[in-house]
Amino acid sequence: QTWNTVAKECTSTYGPEDVAYVEVSPPQESIQGTQWWTSYQPVSYKLDSKLGTEAEFKNMIKQCNAVGVDIIADVVLNQTTGADVADGKQTGVAGTEYNGSTGDYPGFATEQYPEGITASDFHSCSKNISNYANQQEVQECRLSSMWDFDSESEKVQDIQSDYLAALWNAGVRGFRMDAVKHIHTDSMKAIKENLLLISRP
């Protein structure tokens, strides 16, 4: 799957078959690799991924919309990278540098937060989740060794709501929230409220 092939499918199949929505894979930059799960380890919220460039992503949305198909994007807000890429400085699929050992992800930088994401922007729990009956552990410890965003942080909420707004402004009309049970409910409410404020015309 690439954004170009999805665009072609919209034109040749989904539109003519009156499909209303198509869900696509996470569109943000991720770690390198061809395996499906690499898309769920973001290193920035740039819309350049192994599926195509930002321009190709936006063109796909335009082509699908033209035949009556709206796009739902899979969104990864719970975590960044895991132990499989925790070996010093590396680069994502779009060339963004990050350090999975120290928790430094400058690619998440915004105008408000030019330093990007650092280790202090993650929950302090560094162990993997093992007890799914413990809500705090489920929502603050690591899923499969991946760094767990401190979603209660205003900084993290701002960066993530900006990302969702960028998707909305690109034409995405729905979100499938990956691993949302691992994020505090109040945090998701705050991110949604921020999104509503900044995505209004």
Regions found by a protein language model. Name each.
Residues 1-11, 16-170, 186, 190-201:
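Substrate-binding/active-site clefts of carbohydrate-active enzymes
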